[in-house]
């Protein structure tokens, strides 16, 4: 990873932000080459999903009032576990500290993380001490205020673009003449106050997002022809489910066997593979990993990560 980051920096693709003032971890600049690549990827994404006749593009604010994020669950649930070193005061994501000792450390609870840190004698990456406070949840949103002084309202920089699209649902519903299904897509900035950003661009505090929200009638879901995607892909189903482990399977077979829980999800997985191939990704380097129940986002009933 360090060699890749060094190469991207030398070639003017991605560089650390504010470097002459010491820099800030989790913030990057796109140089002349990187900005052009980013623009081409975003344009390709919009072209791909915009080709669906019942999907439109929207643009909503990055500042989100607190009530919206209370309703979505982000104020109460959008957390990572943090461990603080008593010796130097350094704060680190607890699951990152034990990543080499557990296959899925982000699924562990606070007490399990504390036990593993103690059992494996995990030392502080900054000062090499072994004196940790108990792991505790830290909300990942940047808080701000709207207005001045006593009349201000609590708000947050959006952690994702989805909430803006949900707020637009009544307008979108009217736009589509009150008929489901339909979708809205949006690109733009997202913000997450990561505890300990690392891995180059993998964990950033300000990052670019491209999201699509697709609204269906759960009692009358759209049925798409998945036979158009006969090729098998690499999938890693829920490790706690009936078929754990890596398998090669088509999207249609994955739906019929119950691995993918909904036809719309299967269709979007297939369309995602099409997009990746369109921008030049080798399909043999792609896999789809299903989230375990303990890993699932607080609002999800099924979730898949596309990993390259």
Task: Give the location of each predicted region.
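TRNA-recognition modules of translation machinery and tRNA-sensing kinases, especially anticodon-binding
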Residues: 1-308
């Amino acid at each position: 990873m360090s060699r890749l980051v060094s190469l991207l920096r030398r070639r003017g693709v991605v560089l650390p932000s504010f470097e002459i003032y010491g820099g800030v971890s989790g913030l990057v600049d796109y140089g002349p080459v990187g900005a052009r690549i980013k623009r081409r990827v975003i344009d390709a994404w919009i072209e791909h999903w915009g080709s669906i006749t019942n999907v439109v593009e929207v643009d909503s604010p990055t500042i989100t009032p607190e009530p919206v994020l209370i309703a979505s669950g982000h104020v109460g649930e959008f957390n990572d576990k943090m461990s603080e070193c008593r010796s130097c005061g350094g704060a680190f994501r607890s699951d990152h500290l034990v990543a080499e000792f557990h296959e899925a450390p982000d699924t562990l609870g606070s007490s399990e993380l504390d036990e593993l840190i103690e059992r494996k004698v995990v030392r502080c990456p900054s000062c090499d001490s072994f004196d940790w406070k108990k792991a505790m949840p830290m909300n990942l949103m940047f808080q701000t205020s709207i207005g001045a002084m006593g009349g201000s309202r609590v708000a947050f920089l959006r952690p994702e673009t989805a909430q803006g699209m949900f707020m637009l649902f009544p307008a979108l519903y009217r736009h589509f003449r009150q008929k489901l299904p339909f979708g809205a897509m949006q690109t733009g900035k997202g913000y997450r106050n990561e505890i300990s950003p690392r891995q180059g661009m993998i964990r950033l505090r300000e990052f670019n997002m491209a999201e699509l929200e697709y609204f269906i009638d759960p009692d009358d879901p759209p049925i798409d022809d998945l036979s158009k995607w006969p090729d098998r892909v690499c999938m890693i189903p829920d490790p706690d489910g009936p078929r754990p482990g890596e398998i090669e399977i088509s999207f249609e077979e994955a739906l019929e066997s119950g691995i993918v829980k909904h036809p719309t999800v299967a269709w979007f997985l297939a369309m995602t593979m099409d997009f990746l191939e369109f921008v030049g990704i080798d399909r043999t380097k792609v896999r789809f990993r299903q989230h375990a129940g303990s890993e699932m986002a607080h609002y999800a009933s099924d979730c898949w990560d596309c990993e390259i």
